[in-house]
């Protein structure tokens, strides 16, 4: 079986009691199904920029990305022998104008406001998004509940989640073949503390990018793994600690066009790294439990004053710096 990974960025935008949703067209990921606006991130693209771009393309609205609200993963299997894992990031959006869409879309408003497969809503646009999206609407939750929604959209809106029929997802159009020298890596990392306020850090082993730097516990998630599950697994492997996730802090974007790692040749790396706050209620001595030859050389507990004097990775410096504000 072939395994594909994908990262998408989506937005939740409210206008009073109405939320902005789009329906995928024939070239979309879920043809005929309604979802939150957004889509796949491009190589090296920050998820915040990706959601702003996708919303503009699909709705002609100008928005800004606000707080990262949630990150979830889903897996779809296909008869062609392909399993697609998608990590989806959901941002709260702020509208930069007071229009549903650009004035040029006025002649595309549906005359009677009918959605065809559900309730009636005003301000409906059709034929948006260049074929990937064919309808755009502001809907109340009651109206949205009467439509066919992607599971991730229903979950984000607090509505009942209904599995889609087999064959609804179309990865052959949505997922081009991977570039031989490009890598996309989705990872979950933790600003891990104990009740005394100490911070757990891990040192990157030789042979890996950033060798010798002190890093946040965490790493790439496995196929089919939720981000928080992967983070807590890595916490055990890299630091020997049992923790609990208490807060989603944000997302960091890494692009290194010539990263040299265990592969032995320079690769164009794009890393999407979500950061959580993790509490270890009963800390123990930090011990690396993963097999020898892994990316972690050692781990340790540090006060914040000690941590800021260490050679830190970019993401560790970012998280520790923000925690002290």
Please annotate each region the language model reported.
Residues 11, 68, 89-93, 188-190, ...:
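A structural signal for short, well-ordered beta-strand segments
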Residues 62-71, 242-251:
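A short coil-to-beta-strand element that immediately follows conserved catalytic motifs
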Residues 1-12, 158-191, 204, 266:
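Acidic, metal-coordinating catalytic segment for phosphate/diphosphate chemistry
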Residues 18-58, 198-241:
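Conserved Nudix-box catalytic region and its N-terminal flanking loop in Nudix hydrolases
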Residues 103-113, 117-161, 286-322:
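NUDIX/MutT-family hydrolases
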Residues 3, 33, 81-87, 130-133, ...:
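A generic structural micro-feature
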Residues 17, 73-107, 121-124, 254-287:
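Active-site-adjacent beta-strand/loop module that shapes the phosphate/pyrophosphate-binding cleft
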